[in-house]
Amino acid sequence: MMEAHFKYHGNLTGRAHFPTLATEVDTSSDKYSNLYMYVGLFLSLLAILLILLFTMLLRLKHVISPINSDSTESVPQFTDVEMQSRIPTP
């Protein structure tokens, strides 16, 4: 038994390597499990990015045109930066 084990002590190309259980043909349920995982990960990241995009767009919309309770008021409203530039300096 030990003689057969030490027979190929040099180059190992003569040995026959049989496939293990991990390299055998997958079943139909295991074949698509990685695909489902990657598709689910992609869709969840896409949903998070879309939520962030819409949140940023809504914030930008409120910065550009803020919501006023008195919409009939015709007096133009300015931000602090615009008001400081309109103040005359002596």
UniProtKB/Swiss-Prot annotation:
UniProt KW keywords: Glycoprotein, Membrane, Transmembrane, Transmembrane helix
Subcellular location: Membrane
Gene Ontology CC terms, in alphabetical order: intracellular membrane-bounded organelle; membrane
Glycosylation sites: 11
Principal subcellular localization: membrane
A Pfam family annotated for this UniProt entry: SRTM1
Domain of life: Eukaryota
Chain segments annotated as transmembrane: 38-58
Region described as Disordered: 69-90
Membrane topology type: Single-pass membrane protein
Protein name: Serine-rich and transmembrane domain-containing 2
Organism: Homo sapiens (Human)
Taxonomic path: Eukaryota, Metazoa, Chordata, Craniata, Vertebrata
Gene name for this UniProt entry: SERTM2
